[in-house]
């Protein structure tokens, strides 16, 4: 019984850490870097490009619905989008190696209405980062002004304050 408990604990720990630590490949953008070129087709049929996001204020969110930290921050992001999009802030929700069907199911189950780009690979993600989701970039006029990951745990207030600084 003890061996089963230890084995089960290890399996759970490995699963939880999989959204945080992965093999390191890809860019490592920092505050002050320029939003890279990319094109993503969103779930509503629209297209988002790096060039579009280099104009004005934007928030780029990389996520997977299986990641516990992403699940914690997505309600904040829905609220931020509802509040700041009318002020001209653009939002791009881009999955990291997750297909449309599982995202759509998660969105429906949680009442989200955010357009997303389902990326079955890590190509767009790796233009920005090598590891860790959630990963949120708040940018103004093409420059990354703030980067948020899962550590420390993200609050709505922190994210809103970073957007406020960019729109003032």
Regions found by a protein language model. Name each.
Residues 59-60, 91, 136:
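Hydrophobic beta-strand anchors of alpha/beta hydrolase catalytic cores
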Residues 50-71, 77:
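Short active-site neighborhood of thiol/selenol oxidoreductases, capturing the structured segment around
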Residues 138-168:
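Thiol-/selenol-based redox modules, centered on thioredoxin-like
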Residues 71-110, 121-126:
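Structural microenvironment flanking redox-active thiols in thiol-disulfide oxidoreductases
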Residues 15-18:
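C-terminal motif of bacterial Sec signal peptides marking the signal peptidase cleavage site
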Residues 20-50:
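N-terminal "domain-start" segment that seeds a small globular fold
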Residues 4-13:
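Sec-dependent N-terminal signal peptides
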Residues 107-141:
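Short, internal strand/loop/helix patches
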């Amino acid at each position: 019984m003890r061996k089963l408990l230890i084995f089960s604990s290890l399996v759970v720990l490995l699963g939880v850490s999989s959204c945080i630590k992965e093999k390191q490949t890809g860019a490592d953008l920092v505050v002050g870097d320029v939003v890279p070129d990319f094109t993503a087709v969103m779930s509503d049929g629209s297209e988002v490009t790096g060039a579009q996001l280099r104009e004005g204020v934007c928030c780029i969110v990389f996520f997977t619905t299986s990641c516990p930290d992403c699940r914690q921050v997505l309600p904040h992001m829905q609220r931020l989008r509802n509040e700041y999009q009318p002020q001209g802030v653009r939002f791009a929700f881009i999955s990291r190696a997750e297909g449309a069907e599982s995202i759509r199911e998660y969105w429906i189950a949680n009442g989200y209405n955010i357009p997303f780009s389902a990326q079955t690979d890590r190509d767009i993600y790796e233009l920005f980062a090598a590891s860790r989701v959630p990963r949120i970039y708040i940018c103004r006029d093409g420059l990354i002004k703030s980067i948020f990951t899962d550590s420390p745990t993200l609050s709505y207030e922190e994210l809103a304050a970073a957007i406020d600084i960019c729109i003032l």
